Amino acid sequence: MPELPEVEVVRRGLEEHLVGRRFTDVQVCHPRAVRSGEPEVLVSSLRDATVTAVKRRGKFLWLDFGEDFLLQVHLGMSGQMLVAEPGQVQSPHVRIRAGLSDGRELCFVDQRTFGEWRLEKAVPDPWAAGAGVASPKNFLPQNVSHIAADPLEAVFDAQAAVARMKSKRAAVKTVLLNQEVVSGIGNIYADEALFLAGVRPRRSAALLSRPTLHRVLQSAAEVMECALEQGGTSFDSLYVNVNGASGYFSRSLNVYGRGGEPCKRCGAPIKRVVVGGRSTHYCATCQR
């Protein structure tokens, strides 16, 4: 499942190619791609709609048309949003094709069919209001309104996030994965952030000091910014940007997926454990 950096890479690519473009036609090629609604409604709503913005919160991605609805895009396990010349994308896994006013087309390719496009009501962003930056432009899908702001957003309130973390007695790794506490951090970047912060994943968030929790959040932001610079993390060909290129942050991972291998910092073997049902990696020497 793509995490924040991978979704942000896609968002930036879509923003470059879609903003100001109008959907001239939409073809649903597979019903599962619109399983949360009627394909006919999606097609009629998007036809002649002009993209005004491409936005994201955590792992959630959506297109804004300046209307009372938004197009939420779930990438799922293998979803790809590719912008190409008409007919250039010949994959048998194309689920939706949308013609653009500049003559190109947007293709939603999804091999495993866990992803989808869905129309959602646009509602004011409660997290933006709480951070004191509310504006008429701060709208998001109704079903995302409970998702906390992520560490790379302008509306992110680190002190409030630390307070939410401090109220949880669960392992700090588990708390980092709670999208209502802080969004966008998945299994990969939680492990990497905790390594950078020097904190063991099983420690109770409630028992960590506020400065330590701030350090964990700052480390998460640093790790994800670094991943963004490298195009995200690609372990297979299923995660690509809008041009079909893969990211290469996987080469920079310090602990995730490296169980039994030597720590790049101290040489001790990386430990693999299960925390909250999730495979977790850490260095017992570098993390306390």
UniProtKB/Swiss-Prot annotation:
Catalytically driven reaction(s): Hydrolysis of DNA containing ring-opened 7-methylguanine residues, releasing 2,6-diamino-4-hydroxy-5-(N-methyl)formamidopyrimidine; 2'-deoxyribonucleotide-(2'-deoxyribose 5'-phosphate)-2'-deoxyribonucleotide-DNA = a 3'-end 2'-deoxyribonucleotide-(2,3-dehydro-2,3-deoxyribose 5'-phosphate)-DNA + a 5'-end 5'-phospho-2'-deoxyribonucleoside-DNA + H(+)
InterPro entries: DNA_glyclase/AP_lyase_DNA-bd (IPR015886), DNA_glyclase_Znf_dom_DNA_BS (IPR015887), Formamido-pyr_DNA_Glyclase (IPR020629), FPG_cat (IPR012319), MutM-like_N-ter (IPR035937), Ribosomal_uS13-like_H2TH (IPR010979), Znf_DNA_glyclase/AP_lyase (IPR000214), Znf_FPG/IleRS (IPR010663)
Pfam family, one: H2TH
SUPFAM superfamilies the record matches: Glucocorticoid receptor-like (DNA-binding domain), N-terminal domain of MutM-like DNA repair proteins, S13-like H2TH domain
Subunit structure: Monomer.
GO MF term set: 8-oxo-7,8-dihydroguanine DNA N-glycosylase activity; class I DNA-(apurinic or apyrimidinic site) endonuclease activity; damaged DNA binding; zinc ion binding
Function: Involved in base excision repair of DNA damaged by oxidation or by mutagenic agents. Acts as a DNA glycosylase that recognizes and removes damaged bases. Has a preference for oxidized purines, such as 7,8-dihydro-8-oxoguanine (8-oxoG). Has AP (apurinic/apyrimidinic) lyase activity and introduces nicks in the DNA strand. Cleaves the DNA backbone by beta-delta elimination to generate a single-strand break at the site of the removed base with both 3'- and 5'-phosphates.
Cofactor: Zn(2+)
Active site: 2 (schiff-base intermediate with dna), 3 (proton donor), 59 (proton donor), 278 (proton donor)
UniProt-listed HAMAP family: Fapy_DNA_glycosyl
The enzyme's E.C. designation: 3.2.2.23, 4.2.99.18
Cofactor annotation remark: Binds 1 zinc ion per subunit.
Descriptive protein name: Formamidopyrimidine-DNA glycosylase
